[in-house]
């Protein structure tokens, strides 16, 4: 196994841990979202929301870095991430590059905007919860590609 494939395998293993942690956060947040009165949230609920937002963001970020590593292995120009996304779409890892970008915009918006608007914050959190399944699907398709193309075992 080349050094780059070993690095790719370690990224996939790390993604699996991140996926598990994100799943835990989803379970915690689903217990109290939507939130009727944000100021009344308990400290542990705020902590669960913060953990969910961070884990969601980091999971997508690391998934993107892993897709970039696959593109490098396949000798695709990775100077522009849009090229990586288009390549992942061709491999059928992603449904569409636009959907990936929508998820990225969502995570950026929830981390920077509307913190005083309960309705918008609820909508962002609920949409993020709904998009977890898409990210997990992209992750699984990336694992499948790496297993077929490189014989990598991501466990």
Q: Where are the regions a protein language model picked out?
A:
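Solvent-exposed interaction patches of small proteins and small membrane subunits
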Residues: 1-155
